[in-house]
Amino acid sequence: MSGHSKWHNIQAKKGKTDAKRGKIFTKIGKELMVAVKNGGPSPETNNRLRDIIAKAKAANMPNDTITRSIKKASGELGSVNYENIIYEGYGPSGVAVIVETLTDNKNRSAGNVRSAFTKGGGNMGTQGCVGFMFQEKGEMVIEKADKDEDEMMMLALDAGAEDFNADEDEVFVVTTTPEDFGTVREALEAEGIEFLEADVKMIPDTYTAIDEADAKKFQKMLDLLEDDEDVQEVYHNAEFPEGWEE
């Protein structure tokens, strides 16, 4: 079945910041705390917390770090309140960009996000200006290695997956509805499947090709956003030039 994640194309542009393991753990730690605040500290009764714990483990986050984040959100180790704010806007060539933040200072985050858009040749827009161009989907990325494609596809679809993409060179990409994400992930985990990445995210309906000049500008924007302490996720619909390397 064909998919539309273009996972490899996008991940190649994120590798520079994703290699900073400490930043990743900080971002996931914030998500854990917000999930606990909203639904309680027990993963048995808090589906969102269970999903984020799985995401943390896929990122090789140590168990004691996960536990510490949960305790902090429960008030056992003090507490910090984060506000979830979504920013939308445009990059070079009209690329659609959604920036998800968790912040304890919305004035700081708004200023930093706006600055990143400007420095990257884009502009921050109003709420909803590009959101309609994306769909919220669950996505699990699995290393192909020696796995049988047909067997993997049947496992995913039987578990309730919406789509299975084997077009990428090195990975399978399983797509679900947000509601079915946890169920499908747990079913695949029960079969011994491990994930390179597993999360609910915003996936664009279509992609916008950009040339090398705009790719350089846009990469600058992505680096600024992804290095910002308040930014959790950056979603976009840019298709970088073939063979593009930062």
Curated annotation (Swiss-Prot):
Gene3D superfamilies according to UniProt: 1.10.10.200, 3.30.70.980
GO biological-process terms attached to the record: regulation of DNA-templated transcription
Keyword check for Membrane: no
Entry GO MF terms: DNA binding
GO cellular component: cytosol
InterPro entries: Integrase-like_N, TACO1_YebC-like_2nd/3rd_dom, TACO1_YebC_N, Transcrip_reg_TACO1-like, Transcrip_reg_TACO1-like_dom3, YebC-like
Keywords: Cytoplasm, DNA-binding, Transcription, Transcription regulation
Family: Belongs to the TACO1 family.
Protein name: Probable transcriptional regulatory protein CLL_A1008
UniProt source species: Clostridium botulinum (strain Eklund 17B / Type B)
